[in-house]
A protein has these predicted regions:
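Loop/turn residues immediately N-terminal
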Residues: 152-154
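A short, conserved, highly charged catalytic patch centered on acidic carboxylates
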Residues: 1-143, 156-191
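Central hydrophobic cores of alpha-helical transmembrane segments
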Residues: 148-150
Length: 191
């Protein structure tokens, strides 16, 4: 189960490694000031429970980001995926572009994976998010990026399946970086 991936050593059992580096995260298109202000209104609300973080922080950011994009996107919650006996479980949120003939509950080809860190630190969810990215690749999806969030802290991951490496961005982002987080998500989904 994905929730069993708690340490880097757990992920290494899959043949992958987690390494840290300065990722070239896509940020060339900026979200509008109004969108940023709207997102910030949700962030000001207090939260402590996992479902509250999803409902009041993660979902509004995702919704505002996909509203900036042309195209049809789906936001799927608690998606069960199974690539093999070890790489299976529920992914918190998967966002993907949907083709015109698909329904909104279809997992597109290049999804963005969003993992809510349950232990209050993004570092504790690195292996879990990495395992979820690996599983998506094994299922033929071209998920390149994942993001882990507590609501306060954000960490981006990028998978390189040919090298069997999941890179974590060298720098954690915070609520004060919310505009940058939204810009990165916007550009990841735009690709």
């Amino acid at each position: 189960m994905f929730s069993d991936f708690k340490a880097k050593a757990d992920l290494e059992r899959t043949g992958y490694k987690i390494k840290e580096k300065d990722l070239s995260l896509p940020e060339h298109e900026q979200i509008s000031d109004q969108t940023y202000d709207d997102i910030r209104t949700f962030v000001k609300l207090s939260y402590s429970h996992e479902e509250t973080v999803k409902a009041l922080i993660l979902t509004p950011v995702i919704v505002y980001v996909i509203n900036q994009l042309n195209g049809k996107y789906s936001i799927l919650y608690e998606v069960y995926i199974e690539a093999d006996d070890d790489l299976k479980g529920r992914c918190d949120i998967i966002v993907s572009k949907v083709e015109d003939d698909d329904t909104n509950d279809t997992l597109g080809d290049k999804p963005l994976l969003v993992t809510e860190a349950k232990k209050k630190t993004v570092e504790e969810a690195l292996s879990q998010c990495g395992a979820e990215l690996i599983a998506l690749h094994k299922l033929g999806k071209k998920a390149q990026y994942g993001v882990i969030s507590t609501g306060d802290d954000w960490m981006f991951l990028e998978i390189f399946p040919e090298q069997q490496i999941v890179y974590q961005h060298h720098r954690k982002l915070y609520l004060s970086d919310l505009r940058r987080v939204a810009n990165i998500m916007l550009n990841v989904l735009k690709v």
